């Protein structure tokens, strides 16, 4: 099974940027310790601070699915549900 790359774009509401950032940062430590997590990096757009992007690499889809079932991920979803304008998640496989 191929490794899985995730690019997830989260857009915070303008009045919630710092709260969303705080919740996103809480994910880093526990997620990087998860089985199958190869890379889990958070970025913030230089021109629009309300835009955050995760670049993730997972051993496989099962590892990603387990991450999404974790308590820390569920806590994040509950905490930011009303604070974000939207999210776009791309699940990709490296081809070169």
Where in the sequence are the language-model features?
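An amphipathic, aromatic/His-enriched active-site/gating alpha helix that lines ligand/cofactor pockets
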Residues: 26, 32-38, 57-90
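Short, well-ordered beta-strand segments in beta-rich or mixed alpha/beta enzyme
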Residues: 4-10, 41-68
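Extended aliphatic helical segments
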Residues: 7, 17-20, 51-53, 62, ...
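N-terminal first-folded block
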Residues: 4-32
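A broad "ordered helical/assembly scaffold" signature
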Residues: 16, 40-41
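Glycine-rich beta-strand-turn "strand-cap" elements at beta-sheet edges
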Residues: 2, 41-48, 77-96
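Hydrophobic alpha-helical segments with strong N-terminal bias
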Residues: 20-23, 28, 44, 54, ...
């Amino acid at each position: 099974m191929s490794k899985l790359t995730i690019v997830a774009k989260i857009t915070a509401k303008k009045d919630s940027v710092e709260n969303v950032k705080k919740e996103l940062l809480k994910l880093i430590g526990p997620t990087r310790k998860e089985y199958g997590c190869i890379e889990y990096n958070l970025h913030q757009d230089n021109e629009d601070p309300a835009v955050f992007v995760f670049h993730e690499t997972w051993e496989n889809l099962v590892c990603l699915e387990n991450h999404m079932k974790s308590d820390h991920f569920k806590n994040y979803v509950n905490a930011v549900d009303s604070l974000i304008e939207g999210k776009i998640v791309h699940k990709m496989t490296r081809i070169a």
